[in-house]
Structure formats: C-alpha cells, structure tokens
A protein has these predicted regions:
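RNA-interacting cores
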Residues: 1-222
C-alpha cells in the first residue's frame, strides 16, 4: 500500500490570509477543530468519505499529513509538497522522533482514561501543579513503551516537552464537567525491531484524538 507524506501550507494569497481568524483561531481547542475541518478540504471527496489521514500542526499555517491518498490541491492552500513515504528501515535502525499524542489506557470495566489525568487524580489538588510535568514524563514514557511492544520498536529515550488538557469545542458547561483530552508533546529516539510492522502501525497513528491532530509520529534517522 502506498502512503504519502505531505507538507501542506495555507496559501499566502491576501484573500485567504484575510480569513486567518476563521482558518486558524487563537484559542487552542477551537483551532484544533478548525484545522481538522480545513484539512478535510484537501482529502474529502464526498459525504461518505471517512478520515483516512493523520495530520500535525507545525504552526504558521503549516501542516504535515500522512495519508493513503495524496491531498487535493485547492485555493485555500499553497502548492502541496507530496512524497511517497517508504523509509528504508531494517531491524536495529535508530530513529529520532517527535509525537503529539493523546495517551489513554483502559481501566477495569472498559472505560478509557487519559494516562496523565488519571495519575493526577491521585495527587492532592494543591500539589497537582508541581506534579504535572513529572507525572507527564513518567506516564508518557510508560505509555510509549507499551506502544512500542505493539508497534515493533524499543523506546530508547523520550522527553515529554509539554502536557496540556484541551476542552472540546462547543462544551461550555461547568469546567469540571467539560469533556477534555490530554495532549503530550514528546521527542526522543527509538530502535526499530520489525520494519514492516513498525511502518504499518506508524501509518495508523498512535493514541487517540487523531481527528484533532494527534497521533502522527515524524521520524528521521538518528
């Protein structure tokens, strides 16, 4: 199966740039939703199409996508940079990576929880601010190690650079009742065990909230 890695940029055309507040709002959760809709313009081909691409916001109107189909050129975007994604890997290859992920796990009863939020619930409220990033590092590393067991790689090292909790757009009730999802920003190094299995999992994305720009792991040789 052919996979495409594309760099997509919002057009510099003044008529498009004038729509900046709509295409790329300043508030984070609203921006994630707007970008999801924006990128659909490059991939949808009808009302029955299901999302079959991953995406990552790089800031300043630039996005990376990983998809089974090449993105369609529209006036909203500048010329796409598209290439076939077929890295030449072997067992033992070391790769540097960066990943924006919504990391969850299943609890008893089948409910899924954000790994960092769940850990923070065990910490007294007045101590949570100080505990936030150490717990994000610990839980993010443990989660990605588990991902490696399924996706045929060994985690060599990882740094959690940031952790934020995003409120889903359109939920304006009491703050504690608003549905949220956590976003881990991770960079590090991994060792490939089985190239074919690794690339298969990478093309599917890691974690959840993929519609909101999570799950796309960018890699380069170490």
């Amino acid at each position: 199966m052919t996979i495409f890695l594309s760099k997509i940029k919002i057009s510099d055309n003044p008529s498009i740039q004038s729509l900046g507040a709509l295409l790329s709002p300043s508030e984070t959760s609203t921006r994630m939703t707007a970008h999801h809709r924006l990128l659909w313009a490059a991939f949808t081909d009808g009302p029955e199409r299901k999302r079959d691409f991953l995406w990552r916001d790089e800031g300043k109107g630039v996005f990376f996508t990983l998809s089974k189909r090449p993105p369609v050129q529209t006036d909203i975007f500048g010329p796409h940079q598209i290439k076939t994604f077929a890295p030449d890997l072997s067992a033992g290859t070391l790769l540097n990576f960066k990943l924006r992920a919504n990391a969850t796990r299943a609890k008893r009863g089948g409910a899924r929880v954000d790994v960092v939020m769940d850990a923070l619930h065990e910490v007294p409220k007045l101590e949570r601010s100080d505990a936030r990033m150490p717990l994000a590092q610990r839980e993010g590393k443990a989660w990605l190690t588990r991902q490696g067991e399924k996706a045929a790689f060994n985690l060599v090292e990882v740094t959690v650079e940031n952790y934020t909790a995003q409120v889903l757009e359109g939920n304006n009730g009491a703050l504690k009742r608003q549905p949220k999802f956590g976003v881990l920003e991770m960079t590090g190094r991994l060792e490939v065990n089985e190239p074919e299995a690794f690339l298969s999992h990478l093309s599917q994305g890691f974690g959840r909230a993929k519609a909101f720009g999570c799950g796309l792991m960018l890699i380069r040789r170490a």
